Amino acid sequence: VPLQELSGWHRHPDYARLRADAIREFAADEGIDLADSDTALVFSAHGTPTHYLEAGSRYDVYVEEYCSVQASLLGVSEYEVGYQNHENRDIPWTEPAVEDLVPELDADRVVVEPVSFLHEQSETLSELDVELREEAEAAGLAFHRVPIPHDDDRIAEVLADLVEPFLADFDPGYHQLRQCQ
């Protein structure tokens, strides 16, 4: 069975829209105005050891690019990006660490969007919902975490759209997605 690599799919416009819709709907349900100066929007991305970046990975660039698109879709000009690192390993990780970033925010509330995750897991349910919430509340911030829209029907549609070129034997460049490094 031939193996095809599909990378860069976070750039698919329908995926970007469905994630922005989830943030917008969550904020509306919580009565939060994302443009309010007392609200800080934080995109929390999975961290990576910096030696991968030094070796040529552009992961941090892709995270920044994706967050910029999300902010634009939301009509928000100010936001922060933090990384969930595994600092129990004695190597340098991407910065800033989200747990260092959040307590320093100049806001009354923080809305955290876990941008690197497609489903709920320990890194969202424990690291964000429990540990980061404790850090935020200790700093006097109301904490809100956007649920991952893993059950949104549009995710399956996006994935099908991305896989179809490979199955139909036409150029995967059809989507004009650049390969990630």
What kind of region is each of these model predictions?
Residues 1-181:
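Extended amphipathic ligand-handling, pore-lining, and cofactor/metal-binding catalytic surfaces
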